[in-house]
């Protein structure tokens, strides 16, 4: 491994280790997301704690910290293999941040950001898959799980040279959602939004 590749991987990990959820919550004087809500320092939990505006800020920074190192490595001529390692390093930084005792989030937004430099068509498909799943089910975690499962197939169709590293990213995301999968199976997962029951009349509650 070259010094350049090693440097990019380390830079990606350090970028990922900057926990947007924790830092933004501190900035807005909100509770630590690691100790409130679901306990996960990610945009969905911040949505529960601080509302849409703060959650959107966290989401943007989580995406950017995956996108920046991969975009930089891409434009500096890194091979697909090392681009994949750079993307994985950014997500590992988010999940196991060195600056926050190695206790981080689940890496979904950071993974999306890391995939973005590969192609905006892929990014659009991934985002659309997540949004459609969440709109139909109400579960943010299910959106992440479905997107992670289908991402390698999207990449194989559009940019096959990146299939293996994206498959590794997907495995990482699915492993981090192990508890969510169990709660979904038991019907105990918390929805981010609920459909209104149209069967209820105006006088029913």
UniProtKB/Swiss-Prot annotation:
The keyword Transport does not apply. Pathway: Lipid metabolism; phospholipid metabolism. The keyword Lipid biosynthesis applies. It comes from the Bacteria. InterPro entries: G3P_acylTferase_PlsY (IPR003811). Keywords: Cell inner membrane, Cell membrane, Lipid biosynthesis, Lipid metabolism, Membrane, Phospholipid biosynthesis, Phospholipid metabolism, Transferase, Transmembrane, Transmembrane helix. Its main location: membrane. GO terms for molecular function: acyl-phosphate glycerol-3-phosphate acyltransferase activity. GO terms for biological process: phospholipid biosynthetic process. Probably interacts with PlsX. Catalyzes the transfer of an acyl group from acyl-phosphate (acyl-PO(4)) to glycerol-3-phosphate (G3P) to form lysophosphatidic acid (LPA). This enzyme utilizes acyl-phosphate as fatty acyl donor, but not acyl-CoA or acyl-ACP. Belongs to the PlsY family. This is Glycerol-3-phosphate acyltransferase. It comes from Erwinia tasmaniensis (strain DSM 17950 / CFBP 7177 / CIP 109463 / NCPPB 4357 / Et1/99).
């Amino acid at each position: 491994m070259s010094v350049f590749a090693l440097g990019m991987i380390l830079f990606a990990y350090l970028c990922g280790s900057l926990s947007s959820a924790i830092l933004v919550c501190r900035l807005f004087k909100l509770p630590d997301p690691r100790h409130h809500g679901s306990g996960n320092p990610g945009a969905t939990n911040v949505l529960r704690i601080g509302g849409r505006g703060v959650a959107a800020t966290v989401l943007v920074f989580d995406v950017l910290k995956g996108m920046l190192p991969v975009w930089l490595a891409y434009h500096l001529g890194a091979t697909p293999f090392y681009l994949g390692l750079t993307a994985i390093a950014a997500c590992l930084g988010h999940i196991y941040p060195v600056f926050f005792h190695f206790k981080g989030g689940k890496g979904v937004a950071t993974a999306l950001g890391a995939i973005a430099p590969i192609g905006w068509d892929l990014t659009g498909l991934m985002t659309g898959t997540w949004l459609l799943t969440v709109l139909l089910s109400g579960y943010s975690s299910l959106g992440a799980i479905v997107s992670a499962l289908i991402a390698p197939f999207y990449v194989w169709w559009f940019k096959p040279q990146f299939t293996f590293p994206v498959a590794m990213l997907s495995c990482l995301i699915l492993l981090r959602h192990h508890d969510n999968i169990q709660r979904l199976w038991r019907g105990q997962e918390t929805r981010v939004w609920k459909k209104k029951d149209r069967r209820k009349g105006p006088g029913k509650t």
